[in-house]
Amino acid sequence: MSDASLTKINWQPTASIQTLLKRSKIMAEIRQFFTDRGVLEVETPALSEYSVTDVHLSTFSTEFLSPFAKQAKTLHLITSPEYHMKRLLAAGSSSIFQLCRVFRNEESGKRHNPEFTMLEWYRPHFDMYRLINEVDDLLQQILDCEPIESYSYQFVFQTYVGLDPLSASRAQLVEKARKHGFACEEDENRDTLLQFLFSEIVEANIGQERPTTVYHFPSSQAALAQISSEDHRVAERFEIYYKGLELANGFHELNDAKEQIRRFERDNQLREQMNLPPQPLDMRFLAALKAGIPNCSGVALGVDRLIMLALNANHIQEVMAFGVERA
């Protein structure tokens, strides 16, 4: 390779050094926020024996071959530290947080990079609303923004889509989705329709002036959240949006191992229907649930998007040392 060819290679970072200095200060401020509240910082593996069953997540995988092993072992880069952190909760860690790199084999663009930084924390004895208040405190401190406003999923869906997401027929959802450009079939999965309408219509109308929490997602979208004891049609799950970005996703955490197994198995059934490979269940995580995790709430927050908002950046790679195109 000649020296001339090297001069044509763009080796420079995607973020300016000035931006990286500001990023470092924000990361330190986040850590201080939790230190002041007595929350323990933890580190958990980036590689896991298990993938995830969620049909909306795709992992990066690699093969680990020990010098003494007869065959390679498949390992997956984590999409979230959730399962490992809940194992720490089961072991008695009390309140914990983590700043770590996570990996999703998906799109890359203005708001997405396949490798990004996640802030995740868990608060024993917090209900969903108390945790939302703590997220609000963090956002006001980092972004100097107005306090969060909160609405139920049902309310914002009815307001902007014009249908009740908890009672609308599949035919009504299909008709509305088609009007907004979704080429769906009559038997399209109900949650796929809800998620399309929410992302296409609702998200564009919320969180523009101040951070907005949407809570009580349909129970079919509970993921790892508990079902509401007051209304079994909805889950104790929330998401936070601000200025066109989904910032955080939180749960009043499910702590019933049998119910979690049922949900994982339903995920795998859906994966088969979508011609996706089913995934083995994370037995270590399920064993920890059976051993018992405390009643708690937890949330995952996209740090790069938070920094985008803090620094008025237009592209996620502007706040990363090296985006995927220059990794």
Swiss-Prot record:
Which GO terms fall under molecular function for this chain's record?
acid-ammonia (or amide) ligase activity; ATP binding; lysine-tRNA ligase activity; tRNA binding
Cross-referenced Pfam families: tRNA-synt_2
Residues binding ATP are: R104, N105, E106, N113, E246, L247, G302
Give binding positions for substrate. S80, P81, E82, Y122, E253
| Superkingdom of the organism of origin | Bacteria
Q: Could you tell me the EC number(s) of this protein?
A: 6.3.2.-
Question: Can the keyword rRNA processing be found in this entry's annotation?
Answer: no
GO terms, biological process: lysyl-tRNA aminoacylation
Look up the record and report any one GO term of the cellular component aspect: cytosol
**Keyword line:** ATP-binding, Ligase, Nucleotide-binding
Disulfide pairings: none
Q: Which reaction does it catalyse?
A: D-beta-lysine + L-lysyl-[protein] + ATP = N(6)-((3R)-3,6-diaminohexanoyl)-L-lysyl-[protein] + AMP + diphosphate + H(+)
Main EC class the enzyme belongs to? ligase
Q: Which InterPro entries match?
A: Aa-tRNA-synt_II, aa-tRNA-synth_II, aa-tRNA-synth_II/BPL/LPL, EpmA, Lys-tRNA-synth_II_C
Similarity comment text for this entry: Belongs to the class-II aminoacyl-tRNA synthetase family. EpmA subfamily.
Binding partners and assembly: Homodimer.
- Known PANTHER family for this protein? ELONGATION FACTOR P--(R)-BETA-LYSINE LIGASE, LYSYL-TRNA SYNTHETASE
Role noted for this protein: With EpmB is involved in the beta-lysylation step of the post-translational modification of translation elongation factor P (EF-P). Catalyzes the ATP-dependent activation of (R)-beta-lysine produced by EpmB, forming a lysyl-adenylate, from which the beta-lysyl moiety is then transferred to the epsilon-amino group of a conserved specific lysine residue in EF-P.
Protein name, entry field: Elongation factor P--(R)-beta-lysine ligase
What is the source species?
A: Haemophilus ducreyi (strain 35000HP / ATCC 700724)
**What taxonomic ancestry is recorded?**
Bacteria, Pseudomonadati, Pseudomonadota, Gammaproteobacteria, Pasteurellales
